Amino acid sequence: MRSPHEVMGHDGHAAMSMDAMADDMRNRFLVAAVLSVPILLWSAIGRQVLHFGAPAPFGLRDDVFQLILSLPVIGYSGWIFFDGAVRALRARTLDMMVLVAVAIAAGWTYSVVVTLRGGGDVFYEASTVLCAFVLLGHWLEMRARGGANDAVRALLDLAPPKAIVIRDGAQVEVPTSEVQVGDLLLIKPGAKVPVDAAVGDGTSEVDESVVTGESLPVAKAPGDALIGGSINTNGTLRARATRVGSDTALAQIVKLVQEAQSSKAPGQQLADRAAFWLVLVALVGGTLTLVAWLLAGRSFSQAILFAITVVVITCPDALGLATPTAIMVGTGLGAKRGILFKNAAAIEAAARVQVVVMDKTGTLTKGEPEVTELYTVGMPEEDVLALAAAVERDSEHPLAEAIVRRAEHAHVASRDATDFENVPGYGALAAVGGHRVAVGNARLMARESIDLDELAGMRDAMAAEGRTVVVVAVDGRPVALMGISDAPRPTAKVAVEALQQLGIDVVMLTGDNRATAERIARELGIREVMAEILPADKAGKIAELQRAGKKAAMVGDGVNDAPALAQADVGIAIGAGTDVAIETADIVLIRSDPFDVATAITIGRATLRKMRQNLGWAVGYNAIAIPIASGIFEPRFGLVLRPEIAALSMSGSSLLVAVNALLLKRLKPPEPEPTAVSPHTVR
């Protein structure tokens, strides 16, 4: 894995931050630029083209004065290129540092020899202006790459520097870095949560958008988890620290983003190999250019200028920047939305996905039972819910909890139940407000000698659609049927539609019975369903799609679906929350929002598109520039590039690549408009 310094060819900057590197490059550029002005004025160009007539100071010859002024440029400003070239050669490789060092050294050394031999045609200005332009390009390039890394910087700034810890009953403000697991934290309204913690006392709403991308505040109560870096909005919380330092979710997110940004995409590996050979071509091409012009009868000074221009303009800097800059922006874009790409290959693979296989429970659905249909006979819905909830409030069964939640959601008045009787496998009975209420399945009704009458057909139809049917009877008379199922997530339908609009096939994979799976699939618009699949067989189903020539992504919870996630071309773990380090996933979605799958693929495609644009520009630029630089158009058209112009062109090309990648920041993936499936009420 290469660091950003290595990606840019600046191993000598390895101990510096990106900002410090940019400042260092700026200082070197300013020295080179300021001194290059008088060097240019007292050069042949200044005398003959600019008609500058002032004599050199102290009675010195023009070339001697230029030599003196060039020493700081070569010794300080340009030293970074010589140092980088030595490092590259020691590593037995060739990079842009080698090319720039050769070009600067060749022109400057030739000029020094001419000066020491009594004077003649020199071009110190070519070496110093070349140095200045390359440094300018790198300075601007680093600033652009620094902008690409804004996402990581923003994440690092989320953690507050101080935390309030309660010790021996007293509130103590300590640096966040000193908080220990188990410490009792006091989190006031408006304050940031310093580390991952669990609420011990108090209720509040917490804004987790800066970490997870979740736009709405999340209600927190005792026992709920808090993410370090999130913002407590309205209530005072006391919480126990659960993870600190590098173990926090925020630290893990930053680590994943940084690892992804410094990893190589498959396309980048090809670009790196091409860059190596391009350097070799430049060195050989420069040598052949020198020899060719000498054989053509030109002077050595003219021939070496052409050779230096070829070496400079062939510099593969743009080729080396083409993919890593786009990767940095793409991963940062995902991180802001709670989408974590594990590596550069994951971005490229996401862009090529043709079919998305989604686990049903917990991915497309909420993963918990919910009353999705209510059919009443002879009694208002509010009364039915009030009576049923009164009976089920004392039960711990998941179906009972679903009925209580539906009653609370409808804001019905709470009633008390007495003589509660739980009948395992059947349901429950109780007395509520003078009525005998039975809530359970058909077997409970038969046990209590309650005839379903007209509700029998409706109950069978609901069961055939895969719902669990609960009957409510009051005083021996059935008054309602409740269809309970695992309801789709609010954004599940629009998530499927978004994927289909991207031209991607969506497949539901589940261990549930086919009737239940097909009902959910119909609601969401999914055309292909793989039902009644054992967990151990899910990976095999993914392999079948791959054998059919499809690039498949698997979306699951990262635990039960681990083998399938590993088998897929892209494994996407959804709903990771604070557990972002899921080993089998290539992409981690912090939120439990299936729409983020479409967003991740959109980001992947946009990033790959930028990578291809940048590579196309870098290759095309060299294909056009090298013949011009070699001077083959000079005899007929008089078209000549000087090394300084070549340096400006090369730097501009690199900057264009970096800026093009930064345009990714303007990408606005479609936002979902939740279309929750409302519970049906029929009377």
Residue ranges and their predicted role:
Residues 25-27, 230, 354-396, 426-507, ...:
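ATP-driven catalytic headpiece of P-type ATPases
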Residues 189, 243, 263, 341, ...:
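Conserved ATP-binding TGD loop and adjacent catalytic N/P-domain core of P-type ATPases
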Residues 18-162, 273, 277-281, 302, ...:
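Transmembrane helix-loop-helix hairpins at the membrane interface
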Residues 126-189, 220, 269-270, 340-341, ...:
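Juxtamembrane coupling segments of multi-pass membrane pumps/enzymes
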Residues 31, 41, 48-64, 90, ...:
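Membrane-embedded alpha-helical bundles of multi-pass transporters
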Residues 154-247, 344-388, 431:
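Conserved cytosolic catalytic loops of P-type ATPases
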Residues 161, 211, 270, 305, ...:
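Conserved catalytic phosphorylation-site environment of P-type ATPases
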Residues 1-62, 75, 154, 169-173, ...:
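Flexible metal-binding regulatory segments at protein termini and peripheral loops
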